[in-house]
Amino acid sequence: MQVLPPSSTGGPSRLFIMRPVATTLLMVAILLAGIIGYRALPVSALPEVDYPTIQVVTLYPGASPDVMTSAVTAPLERQFGQMSGLKQMSSQSSGGASVITLQFQLTLPLDVAEQEVQAAINAATNLLPSDLPNPPVYSKVNPADPPIMTLAVTSTAMPMTQVEDMVETRVAQKISQISGVGLVTLSGGQRPAVRVKLNAQAIAALGLTSETVRTAITGANVNSAKGSLDGPSRAVTLSANDQMQSAEEYRQLIIAYQNGAPIRLGDVATVEQGAENSWLGAWANKEQAIVMNVQRQPGANIISTADSIRQMLPQLTESLPKSVKVTVLSDRTTNIRASVDDTQFELMMAIALVVMIIYLFLRNIPATIIPGVAVPLSLIGTFAVMVFLDFSINNLTLMALTIATGFVVDDAIVVIENISRYIEKGEKPLAAALKGAGEIGFTIISLTFSLIAVLIPLLFMGDIVGRLFREFAITLAVAILISAVVSLTLTPMMCARMLSQESLRKQNRFSRASEKMFDRIIAAYGRGLAKVLNHPWLTLSVALSTLLLSVLLWVFIPKGFFPVQDNGIIQGTLQAPQSSSFANMAQRQRQVADVILQDPAVQSLTSFVGVDGTNPSLNSARLQINLKPLDERDDRVQKVIARLQTAVDKVPGVDLFLQPTQDLTIDTQVSRTQYQFTLQATSLDALSTWVPQLMEKLQQLPQLSDVSSDWQDKGLVAYVNVDRDSASRLGISMADVDNALYNAFGQRLISTIYTQANQYRVVLEHNTEITPGLAALDTIRLTSSDGGVVPLSSIAKVEQRFAPLSINHLDQFPVTTISFNVPDNYSLGDAVQAIMDTEKTLNLPVDITTQFQGSTLAFQSALGSTVWLIVAAVVAMYIVLGILYESFIHPITILSTLPTAGVGALLALMIAGSELDVIAIIGIILLIGIVKKNAIMMIDFALAAEREQGMSPRDAIYQACLLRFRPILMTTLAALLGALPLMLSTGVGAELRRPLGIGMVGGLIVSQVLTLFTTPVIYLLFDRLALWTKSRFARHEEEA
C-alpha cells in the first residue's frame, strides 16, 4: 500500500517553473487555438444524434386505405424489408396516400441508406399500380421532426392556385437546394389544374359514360415525339397542336357526335381552372395561405441551415408580385440561439462566482489572479479540441463547460494553497513553487484521472442517449485535462513570480476578519472531528444509513426521460368524428383557430386540413401554434397548453391534442402526444377486438392524460356489391365498374399539361353539387358489350359499412399506436408502470405484442442501464485509484464518500419537484467524481504524514483533515457555485439545465457536511482492517 513519494524538486512542473517565457507562450498558443476554435464551431440546440431517417410518400388519389395498403404499401415494404442496416420501418396507408418511414442504425451513413432506398423503389416499380400518377418519392427527413422554419404565403389579389404555382417554382425549389434542407412541403393543396366536373344527368341523356369522356380527353391532349424530316439541304422538326393548355380549350373539345352534331365537353361538364386536390387547405392565422414547412436532413446543423434560408429569402421574394406576401411564422433557431445565449451567460456567471469564492478564501489579489487566468484558459482551450472532434456549441457542451468551471479551478486552488503554505512558512517563492508543486503533483494527477474515469462509462452508453452525451463527456474530460496541464505548468510558474511573503501577509480589514472567521471554523471542525474519531462505529452507522437512504430514494423518486422544453412552439392535432367531411373539418378548424388566437400567449397559428404525408385522414387537422418569446408572456408552455385545451373544450364535436416541440426527436411518426405505446398483431381483426378494451382501461388511469389511439375503424364506406353474373351477361367487367367509380369520385388525374416551367393535371370527377351524397351513385352509367348504357344500380346494390380510415404497419405487421401525456403530479416512470400493470390484467393473446415507442422506449432503455452506468463509473474509478495508490484498500475509503452525494442529489431533486431524468443522472455521475476529491486530498496528506513524519494513522488523518479543510471547502464551494447558475436558470432552455444544477448543488452540500467526518473514520477502520489482515497472514506463515 505504498504510494510514490512526492518530489521536492518540482517534479513535472520544474521545467515550466524555470522557463517562464516558454510556459507563457505555450499558454498563449492554447488561448489562440481556443479562440479560433470558438469562432469556427457551429451552434446547435443539442449534439447531432439523429437516426438516419428516410420518408417515402406515394400518392394515389381516390384509393381507399385497404387498396393503398395492399397495392402500394405492402409491395414497397417487402422490398424495403430486405435492406441492411434498417432499424425500424413504419407505414401509414390512408385514403389516397401511403407514407413509409425508414429508420436506420446510427452507424449507417445517410447517403448509403438513400442508395438502398432508391434501389428498393426501383425493384418494386413493376409491382405497383399501372395508373399510379407519380412514382414513390423519398425524402431524407424525419416526419416527426418539427420544421425548422415555417413560412406563410398569402395574397389579397391573386387566387391561391397562382400563388402556389409561383411559390413552388420560384421559392420552394431554391430552398430545397440549400445544404441541410431535407424537405420543403407546401401545405394548402392549391396546385393549379384544369378540373372537369361532369354533369351525370347530361351525359346519361346523351347516352354517354364518364369513360367515354375520359378517353376523349386523354386522346386529345398528348405530348409525344413526332420525329423530324431530314432533306438534302434542310432539317425540319415536326410539331403539332397536340397540347391543350387552358380550361377554355378543354370546354371546346368535341367528345362525341350525335345525329351529326358535335357534343363538346362544355355541354356536359363544368370546366374550370382550379386546384388539383380540392380536399386540402391551409391557413395562417385566419387567412387562407400556402404554408411552407422546411425540414432539415437528419444530422444537418439547424442554425447554419436556417441562416442560409434567411439570407436567400429576400432574393427569392423579389421575384414575386407585390400582392404576394411571405411571412416567417416560426423559426426554431430563435429559441435555440436564446437558449445557447442564456447558457453562455450562465457560464460567465459561473466563472465570476468561482473567482469570487477564490478571493474570499485567499484574500489576496495576486493569488486570485492566478486561478482567474487558469479557469478561462482551460475552458477556451477546450474549444480547439471540440473543433477537431466536429463538435458544436450547444446546450450540453456549454453545460459541460459550466460544470467544468468548478472542476478546473480545483486543481489551481490545490496548487496555489500548497505553495502559499510554504511561502508563509518562510520559503522563497521559487523554492516554495518547486516544493509545493512537486508535493501536490501526484494529487493533481490522481484527481484528474479518477475524475475522467467517472466519465468513461458515459462514452459507452448505448443508442441515441449515448450519442447525445458523448460530446458532453468528452468536452468535460478535455477541459479537466487542460486544467491539469495548466495547474502543473502555468499555475506554479505564476506563483513563483507573483506570490511573496509580503503579498500573502498584507491584510486589510476584510482579510483579517475573514481569517479570524476561518480560524474559528477550522477550530470548531477540529473539535467536532476529535469527537467523531472517538465514536467510529456511530459514524460508520451514519455512513451506512446514507447508503440505505440512497437506495430508498432511488426507488421512490419519480423518474423521467428528458426534461420537457419550452421552445415556444406547440404542435396540435384536431380530431373530429370519423365521418367528417373536408368542408365540415375546415369549418371546425376555423372555429378552433378563433379560440386559440384569443390567447394572450399566442403569436401566430398555422393549420392544415386534408390527407397528405403527415395528416392521415379528413377528420383530423394539424396545427402549429407559435408562442410569443418567453420574456413577452407570463406562462410557460405547459400552462399555455392546459389553458388552450380548456378553451377549445367549449367547441363542440372536436378533441384537441397538444404537445410542445422538443429539440430531441426520437419518434418517427407525427404523434398527438408526447409518449406512445403500440399494439401489434397479425391481423386487423385482432386489433379491433383488443384496442378498445385496452383504451377503456387506460383512459381510467390517473397516471395518464390525453389518452387517444390512431385506431379509427368507423369510417363510413359505401360498399358497391356487384352482381357479377348480371354484369358478366352484359359484358361489364369489375374493371369497368372501378373505372366508372374512379372517374366520378376519385379526383382522377387523367391527363398532363406540359409547360416550360411546370406540369399541371387535368382532373376528372362528377359534379356532386348537382346530386350530393349517396344518391350520386345512382347516376353512374356503364357501357355494355353491345354499346348500350347500363345504370350501375341495375347490376349492383350499395351497402353502408364501416372500415378503418387508415391502416398502420410496424415492420410490415398491422399496428395501433396509443398516445398519452403524463399529468403534472405523475412521472413518466409512473405512467409506464401503470400501463404495464394494466396490460397484464387483460391477458392479451400471444399473437398481439406490445411495445413502447419513441421517447418512452428510450426512457426504458436508459432507466435499465442507469444502475449499470453508475456501477461502471464506480468500478472504473476504483481501478484507476487502485493503480495510482498501489492499494486495494485506499480506493474503497475514497469511494465510501459516494452515497452521501447520492442522498443529497436525490433529496434536492425531490424537494424541487424534479424527476430523476437522464440529465439528473449525469449530474449524479459527475458528483461521484467531485465528492471523492475531498477524500483524495485527505488521504494523500495522511499517507505522506505517516510515511515521512512517522505519525500514527489517527494523528496523520486528523492533521490532514485540518490542513486540507480550507482547500476542500474552497473547491467544494467552487464546484457548487459553478452549478448554481444552472440550478437558478430561468431563461430559454432552463428546463434542460436545471436538473443538473439541482442535483449537483444538493449533492455537494450534503456530501461536504458528511464526508469531512465519515472519511477519516472509514480511513482508520480500513487501516485497522489492513493491520488485522497482515497479522493473520503473518500468524499463518509462522504456523506453516
Curated annotation (Swiss-Prot):
Induction: The mdtABC operon is transcriptionally activated by BaeR. Keywords: Cell inner membrane, Cell membrane, Membrane, Transmembrane, Transmembrane helix, Transport. It comes from the Bacteria. This is Multidrug resistance protein MdtB. Pfam families: ACR_tran. The lineage of its organism: Bacteria, Pseudomonadati, Pseudomonadota, Gammaproteobacteria, Enterobacterales. SUPFAM superfamilies: Multidrug efflux transporter AcrB pore domain, PN1, PN2, PC1 and PC2 subdomains (SSF82693), Multidrug efflux transporter AcrB TolC docking domain, DN and DC subdomains (SSF82714), Multidrug efflux transporter AcrB transmembrane domain (SSF82866). The keyword Aminoacyl-tRNA synthetase does not apply. Belongs to the resistance-nodulation-cell division (RND) (TC 2.A.6) family. MdtB subfamily. GO terms for molecular function: xenobiotic transmembrane transporter activity. The keyword Repeat does not apply. InterPro entries: AcrB_DN_DC_subdom, Acrflvin-R, Multidrug-R_MdtB. The chain crosses the membrane at residues 16-36, 347-367, 369-389, 396-416, 440-460, 472-492, 537-557, 863-883, 888-908, 911-931, 968-988, 998-1018. One of its GO terms (cellular component) is plasma membrane. Coiled coil: none annotated. Part of a tripartite efflux system composed of MdtA, MdtB and MdtC. MdtB forms a heteromultimer with MdtC. HAMAP family: MdtB. It is found in: Cell inner membrane. It comes from Escherichia coli (strain SE11). PANTHER family: MULTIDRUG RESISTANCE PROTEIN MDTB, PTHR32063. It is a multi-pass membrane protein. The MdtABC tripartite complex confers resistance against novobiocin and deoxycholate.
